[in-house]
Design a protein with these regions (language model features):
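Detector for a conserved hydrophobic position within an alpha-helical segment of the HATPase_c
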Residues: 155-157
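Short beta-strand/loop element within the Bergerat-fold HATPase_c
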Residues: 99-112
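Conserved catalytic submotifs in the C-terminal HATPase_c
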Residues: 37, 57, 62-72, 109
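Short alpha-helical segment of the dimerization/phosphotransfer core of two-component systems
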Residues: 10-17
Length: 191
């Protein structure tokens, strides 16, 4: 009856979760080919924030972003960058728990690079945690696969960019991404 149906559901859900873990792992080892397009950073950030807005609202977390109309477009894979931002937001929401702020800013770092900064008012991290966060399987949260940030780093590096995390216990965290304006040309030159 009901109990075996519930069990079947739990098993299906678990199988689904494991499949996801495996596919994330495979992605980590061999990230898929990047599908380069002209990306409007403002639109990308707005879209990615929309995807988590309900979840954030239900936890009392404010999402702050002021678009910069003068920001240059970049050559990048929008789906992958979306994945990067979502991982960072979900990470931030987990660090905050309830009632806090996630702030996103975008600017031109220099002529060749744009900079996206995601700041949260969460619980922060120790030096040990900071050093380990981009390592696969490292997670400070129960029930997390701990692959999110390793995947994030992989995608950013694949774009020829860099990511840095800064944090102190009790003082939130700051994730800074630098992305080349024209990553595709660099990739072509490397072939």
């Amino acid at each position: 009856g009901g109990e075996s149906h519930q069990l079947a559901q739990v098993m299906a859900k678990e199988a689904d979760r494991l499949n996801r873990v495996v596919s994330e792992l495979l992605e980590l080892v061999r990230p898929a080919h990047l599908n380069y397009q002209t990306v409007d950073i403002n639109a990308l950030i707005r879209h990615s924030l929309q995807l988590v807005s309900q979840d954030a609202q239900s936890r009392g977390i404010a999402l702050q972003f002021t678009p910069r109309p003068e920001l240059t477009t970049i050559s990048a894979d929008p789906d992958r960058l979306n994945q990067v931002l979502l991982n960072l937001y979900l990470n931030a929401m987990q660090a905050i728990g309830r009632d806090g702020v996630i702030r996103v800013t975008a600017s031109e770092a220099d002529r060749q690079r744009v900079k996206i900064v995601v700041t949260d008012s969460g619980k922060g991290m120790s030096d040990e945690e900071l050093q380990a966060i981009f390592t696969p399987y490292f997670t400070t949260k129960a029930g997390g696969t701990g692959l999110g940030l390793a995947v994030v780093q992989n995608i950013i590096e694949q774009h020829g960019g860099t990511i840095r995390a800064e944090s102190q216990p009790g003082a939130g965290a700051i994730f800074t991404l630098w992305l080349p304006v024209d990553a595709q040309r660099r990739e072509d030159e490397q072939r």
